[in-house]
Amino acid sequence: MVKLESPAYGFQGTARARAQAARWLLIGLVPAFLVCCAKTQSKPTIPAGNARFEFLTPSLVRMEYSPAGVFVDAPTAVVQKRDWPAVQVQSTQKEGWLIAATSAITLRYRLRSGPFTAANLSVTWNDPAGAAHAWHPGDVDPLNLGGLTYSLDNISKPNLPEGQMDLESPVNDMIPGIDVLLAKAKPGLLSRGGYAFIDDSQTPVWNAHRTWIEPRPQQNGQDWYLFTYNRDYQKVLKQYAELCGPIPMIPRYVLGPWITDFNFEYFPDTVESGQPAFKRYNQRYLQDEVSRLRQNLIPFDTLVLDLAWHNYGWQGGYDWSPLIAHPDELLSWLHSQGVKLSLNDHPGYANTEESILSFNDSHAPQVLKDLGRPLPPKPSFDLDISKLWSFSTDPHDQGLSHHWYATDHAEGRWKPIRIGLPWQDQGYRTYQGVGWYRASVRLPAKLPEALYVYLGEVNKTYRIFVNGKEATHSRIHWPRRLTYTDIAPYVKAGQQNEIVLRVEPGENHGGILRGPVAIRDVAPPPRIYFDLSNREQAEVFMRDLHEPLMRQGVDLWWVDGGSGAVDMPGLNKQLWTNKVFYDYTQQETGRRGFILGRYGDWGSERYPAFFTGDAYSQWPVLAYEVAFSARGGNVLVPYISHDIGGFHGAKIDFDLYARWIEFGTFSPLLRMHSAHANPREGNMRMPWVYGSQGIALMRKYFTLHTQLIPYLYTYTWLAHKESMPILRPLYLQYPELEEAYQHSHEYFFGEELLVAPVLDPSGNRTIYLPPGQWIDFFTGRRYQGGTTFTAHYAVEETPVFVREGAIIPEQSASEYSNAKPLDTLILNVYGSGKGSFDLYEDDGDSLAYTEGQYARTAMTYASSSDGFHNLIIEPTRGTFQGQGQARSYELRIHAADKPSSISVNGREVGGWMWDAGQAAAVVVLPRQSIRDRMSVTWR
C-alpha cells in the first residue's frame, strides 16, 4: 500500500494529513534484521562475511557486499519494503562456496572472495520446460524489452541516427533509424531472458531519527536485486511494486482531457511586454478559450498554464504575471466551469546554475529569511541607460578589424534601437550577421569605487568594450541570463563614456532582448537556489513558494524538470524532486497527490505522472511515442503524458493533428500542448485552427475519452492493486506468442481494447490481431484473430478493436469528467462469448480508498449455443462518501443479430431500439438500487 512510502518530511499540512504521514512513518520503516545460519531455514537472510544475501521471495534475491561489513536495513530512496514473509532456503558450504537454494533459484558465492564479480557469484534457475538459465554480474541482456528515458525533449527524425543503440536495449522495437534515445534508457523489468536486475548500491538511505534521507555510510558497496520470472511478466511487475512501492490512485479528474496555453515568457518593464499582443493574450483570453470549448461541446477538465504565468520568467518567479491580473477571480471562475488549474514549474532546470528564484520576486525576502541567508545590498548608484543605444549591422564582419569599438570610430550605419526586442523585430528581420550596439553615457564627476554595467539578456555570443578597451565580462543566471561587467577600471568620471557591444546572434533572435540595462554600484546578487535533498530547504521551497498558490486554488503542478535542484551523492535528482512535490501537495491538501514530472528511474511509479517533453511534430515522432508509451509498462509507469500534436511545430497538417488526438484518446492522459501558444500565434493546438473539421474531430474524440472514464478508472485501480499498467504492450498479455513481440506500435488499452494508431499520412494500417474473435470498436465489424491485415482509415477514423464478449462501461457525455453523478451507466457488450468486468468507484479525490472506502460492481456476460445471451449485474459491494444508491443502465448490444426479445429479471421489456447499420441494439434498463441484482437476457 501507499503507506509503505513513509517519509513525512517534516512538512506541515492539515491535521489529517499529519496523522496520515505519521502512520506512513510507523508502517514503512520497520527494519528487517534477519540473520539465519541453519541449513534449512525460513528466515531469508544469509550472512557470508562481508556479503549478505536476502531471499525476499523464492524468485527474488537481494545481494549485498560491504567492505566494512556494514549493511543497510533501512529503506532507500528507491527501495521501500524491508519486512518480507519467510522463505524456505536451503544453504550449504562446499569447497569454499556458499550455495543457497529456494524452490525457484540457486545462488552460489565463493566465500571470502571480495566484491561480487562474474567469477565469484551466480544465480541459476530453470524455466517451465526445464531449460537451465544463469545470471552473473556484468551480464548484458540482449533480450530485455526496454525501459524509459528521462524525456523525449527535441526528439525528431533528423536527430535520431541509426547505429547508436545500446546493447541493453532492444534493436527491433521501433521504426529503424529513430530509436537512438533508447541508448540513454536503462533496461526495463521485462525480458525474454526471464530476469531483471536493479542496482541500488548508491542511493541514499532513510534516517528514521531525522525523518529524512542521508547518503549511504559507504559508497563502494554493492546492493543488488535480481528478479527471476521466466515469461511470467505480471509476476515481476507485482514483485517490483512490492519492493519499490505501488502505483497510487490518482484523482479521477486527471483522466479527463487537458489543454495547455501560455507558452511564452513574461518579463515586466520590457518593450515586448507592453505590446498590444501581450495585452490581449491574458486572463480574458484564457476565459474566452475555455468558454469557446464549452460552446463547441468539447469536454475537458484541466487547464495548464505554461511559462507566462510567472513574473520574471520561467526560471525566476512565483509571482503572477500581470497577464493574470486577478488570479483569484480566474481560479474561482475556472472552478465554477469544472476546470482544474495546473501551473508549470522548472525547479533547478537542466542541472545548470540557472536561478530558481529572482531577487525581484515578492517571495524573495521571506525565502532568504527562512533559509538564513542575507538580503542582497541595494544599489545607491543606479543609472538607467536603456534609451541611449544605436545599432549597426556588420554583414562582412569587419567591425573588429576596423576598430568600431574605438571612441573615434567613423564607420557603420548607426540608427537608434530599442532595448528589449531582438533586432529582427526592429527592421532587420532577415539579418543574421554580426550586430553592434553603442551607447554614449555621461557619468558624474564623483563615482563610487565599484561600478557595473548591466546589459540584460544578450543573445548570443558577445564582446564588451568600454572607451575602446575590451572589458572582462560575466554572465549570471538571474532570473535567466543577465550580462554584467565591472567597468570601474575603464570609465572616466565627469565625461562621456562609450560602451560598445558586439553580438553574434543566436537562432532567430539577436541583441539585447530584455533588461535591466543600467550602471550600478553593486554586482547582481547570486541566484537564490535550493537543494531539495536538504529537508529544511525543501520545506521552505514548498511552503514559501508553492503553498500560497495552492491555497489560492491552484490544483496541481507541472514539474517540468528538476535535475538541478537536488545535490546528494547517489540520489536521482528528478525522482527526489518529484517526491518533494508529490508528497508535499498530498500532505498539504489531505487529498491524492498528482504531478506532471519527468521520469526519475526506479521508483517513479510512486509519483505519477510522466511528462515526456518537447518533441517535434512529425510522423516518426508520433510512431515513436506510441511504442514508448507501451514500453512504459515495462517499468510500471502507467501514466505517460505526451504533447498531443507535438511541441515543436505550429499549424501542422490536419491528418497528423487528427492521428495524434486519436492516439491520445486511447491513452490514460490526453493533453494538448505546443510551443505555439503565445500572443503572436494564438494557441495552434486549438481545434478552430482547422475550422469546423477540427472542431468536429476534437469533439468526437474528447467526448469519447471522457465517456470511457469508468472503464479507465477501473484500470487505475488495477494498476494500483495488481501492478498492471493500463496501456500494455502485446507481449504483456501474450508472453508466449511470438507475434506479440513484433508489433510494438499496437497496444492493449486495458484488457479488452486493442489499439493500432495510424502512423503515416496514407491512412493505411497493417494490423495484427491476437488469437480469438475481435470486433471493430466503431463499426461492429467482426475479425478473426491470429491474423494480420491491412486496411485504410479515413482521417476521422482510427483502428480500435474489442475482444468478443467484452463489457465496456461508459458514462454519459458531459462538459467534464465529474459533471454528472454516475447514476446512469452505459454498458457496451460485444458479440457472443464470455466476458466480465468489475467496475471500480470511489470519491475520486481523497485518500479514503486506502482505508477501504470504495465500491465494486461485478458484471458477467455469457452466450449459449442456443442463441441466448445473458448479462448479470451483481449487487454493488462497498461504500464511499457521496455514493449514489440507485442507478439506471443503458445497455448497448454490439455486433449482434437483431434480438427477438429482451427481458430484465425475467420480465420482457419493450421500447428498445435497433440500429441495423451498426448491428446494435439499445435498451434503457429500469432504475434500481445498486444493492439489487439485475439479469438481462436476450435472444
Task: Report each predicted region and the residues it spans.
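Aromatic- and carboxylate-enriched substrate-binding clefts and catalytic-loop regions
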Residues: W135, P299-P379, P505, H509-M698, ...
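Aromatic-lined ligand-binding clefts that engage carbohydrates, nucleic acids, or primary amines
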Residues: A406, W414, G433, V441-G468, ...
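Catalytic and substrate-binding clefts that recognize carbohydrates or anionic sugar/phosphate headgroups
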Residues: Q93-R284, V290-Q295, H792-S814, K820-D823
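An acidic-aromatic loop/edge-strand motif
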Residues: P377-D425, V491-A523
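Catalytic core of carbohydrate-active enzymes
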Residues: G603-F610, E625, G632-H642, G649-F868, ...
